[in-house]
Amino acid sequence: MIGRCFRAARSFGWRSVLFLLPVYATSVNSQENVHFYGALTADACVIPPGKELISLEFGTVSSKFLYKNQRTQGHRFELNLADCDLSIGKMVKITFLATESLGLPGLLALSDDSEAKGIAIGLETLGKKLVPVNNTSEQYELQVGTNVISLYAFIQGEPDAIVNKRIREGGFKSTAMIELNYE
């Protein structure tokens, strides 16, 4: 068995080379068909090493609690910014780029492989103001050096799932990328 697998892999590799040769030969005769563009920028702050990934554990939340209260209390998390240079930017706006919940616009949808259904994850300021995903937040004033921006994340039941008692229990996760815009 091992010998057959090895021979098949070698002959497949050889066929791959044969198919690539005509493509390579034609691309040698082409003129300037690949261009690279970009911009090198200086950011006002950096995210310290080890702080790039923010993981938040909600623990166990009962569907009965969500049927009664619609949402959980916020769980605090922090964005750490370091080496802030105010000559580059004195303010920062945050955008959480993520898949938006259809049942709760502005909140993060759960990942497709989540067992739980009928819920979404919301983000809010310490003053309880919603920070909708895919929208720019309010401005945060920066200080020279280190800055910490604190926010809350919460779980909320989708209205239809609450009315029809269709929140499904199970593990869940959601992911967002953070975009920082300095002014």
Residue ranges with predicted function:
Residues 13-24:
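Bacterial N-terminal signal peptides
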